[in-house]
C-alpha cells in the first residue's frame, strides 16, 4: 500500500514472535525507513485521506477464534495510536471515499464493521448471514441420526464460544460514488451488496467457488472479483449485476486486485502453488481479456496501483 503523495509505501508482515509489524519504505530507494509492531497477523490496510491515519486489520490465525482488532497507525511517526476490537479474523480494510469511515469484515463471525475514522470506535455492526442458509443448516442438523455427531458439534461451539459463519466474508469495498458496499462471501460463493444508508443487505448474487478480493473501477461501473478457489477473475456490470467476463488466470490461487486510474486495466496478483512464481495478470476491462502477465515473487498477495504517467 502507498500514501497518496507517493513518497512512501507500506507493507504488513503477518508473522512475528508473536506479533506482526508494519514496515515503511521509501518509493525512491525501496529501502526501509521505519517499522512498528502491530497485532497478531496484520493483513490488509489503507490510509484515510481525511485523517491521514493508516488502518490495518489484525487477521489473527493464532490459537482459538476470538475477536481481534484493527490497528490505527500514524504513518508519519509510525506509532500505533490505538487498536479497536471488531470480530473474529477481520480482513479487507477499506476506507470510504470521504475518508470518514473504515470498513472491514470478520471472516469467522460473519460480520461487517464500520469504524468512525475520526472517533476511532466501532460505529455499526451488520450480521451478513443469510437466514435461508441458517434454516438449511438447522434442517441438516435436525436430520442427523447420530447423537455423537450432535455432541461433537456442541463441543465445537463451546470451544471458543463464537458462532462460525457460513458466509465467511473476506473483503469489503465501498462504492466510489454511491453509498453502497460490496462484500466477498468466500464461504457462500456470493457477492453481498450492502446499502450503507439503510445499513442492511440490499442484494446477493452468486459467484464461482471462493470469491476472495473485490475492487470497483474508479468510474463506478465495474466490479472485479478474484475467484480464488478456481484461479479466475470475474467482472460484473454494477448496473444490472450481469457477469461480463470470467478470465482464467495464468496460474492458481487468484488473490489481489488493483485497477488503473482510467478504469481500463485490472492488475491481478496470483499466488501460484508449490515452487511456482507468483504472477501479476493484466486484464483489459474493455474487452475482458487477459493481455499480459509478469512473474514476481512466490505467493503474490497484496497489490496497489499508484498512478498513470504518460
Which residue stretches match the model-derived regions?
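Predominantly soluble domains enriched in secretory-pathway, periplasmic, or organellar proteins
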Residues: 3-310
Amino acid at each position: 500500500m502507498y500514501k497518496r503523495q507517493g513518497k512512501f509505501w507500506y507493507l504488513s508482515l503477518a508473522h512475528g514472535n508473536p506479533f506482526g509489524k508494519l514496515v515503511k519504505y521509501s518509493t525512491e530507494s525501496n529501502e526501509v525507513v521505519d517499522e512498528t509492531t502491530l497485532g497478531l497477523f496484520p493483513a490488509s490496510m489503507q490510509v484515510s485521506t481525511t485523517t491521514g491515519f493508516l488502518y490495518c486489520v489484525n487477521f489473527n490465525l493464532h490459537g482459538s477464534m476470538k475477536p481481534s482488532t484493527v490497528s490505527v497507525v500514524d504513518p508519519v511517526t509510525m506509532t500505533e495510536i490505538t487498536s479497536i476490537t471488531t470480530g473474529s479474523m477481520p480482513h479487507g480494510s477499506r476506507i470510504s471515499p470521504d475518508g470518514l469511515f473504515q470498513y472491514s469484515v470478520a471472516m469467522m463471525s460473519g460480520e461487517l464493521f464500520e469504524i468512525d475514522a475520526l472517533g476511532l470506535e466501532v460505529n455499526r455492526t451488520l450480521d451478513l448471514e443469510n437466514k435461508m442458509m441458517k434454516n438449511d443448516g438447522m434442517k441438516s442438523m435436525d436430520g442427523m441420526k447420530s447423537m455423537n455427531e450432535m455432541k461433537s458439534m456442541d463441543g465445537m461451539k463451546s470451544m471458543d464460544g463464537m458462532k462460525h459463519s457460513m458466509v465467511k466474508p473476506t473483503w469489503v469495498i465501498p462504492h466510489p460514488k454511491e453509498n453502497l458496499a460490496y462484500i466477498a462471501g468466500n464461504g457462500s460463493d456470493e457477492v453481498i451488496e450492502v446499502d450503507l444508508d439503510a445499513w442492511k443487505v440490499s442484494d446477493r448474487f452468486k459467484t464461482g467457488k471462493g470469491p476472495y478480493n473485490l475492487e470497483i473501477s474508479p468510474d463506478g461501473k465495474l466490479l472485479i472479483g478474484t475467484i480464488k478457489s478456481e484461479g479466475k477473475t470475474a467482472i460484473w456490470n454494477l448496473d444490472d449485476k450481469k457477469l461480463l467476463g470470467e478470465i482464467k488466470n495464468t496460474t492458481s490461487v487468484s488473490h489481489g486486485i488493483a485497477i488503473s486510474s482510467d478504469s481500463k486495466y485490472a492488475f491481478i496478483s496470483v499466488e501460484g502453488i508449490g515452487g511456482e512464481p507468483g504472477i501479476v495478470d493484466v486484464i483489459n476491462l474493455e474487452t475482458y481479456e487477459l493481455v499480459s502477465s509478469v512473474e514476481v515473487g512466490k505467493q503474490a498477495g497484496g497489490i496497489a496501483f499508484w498512478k498513470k504517467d504518460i
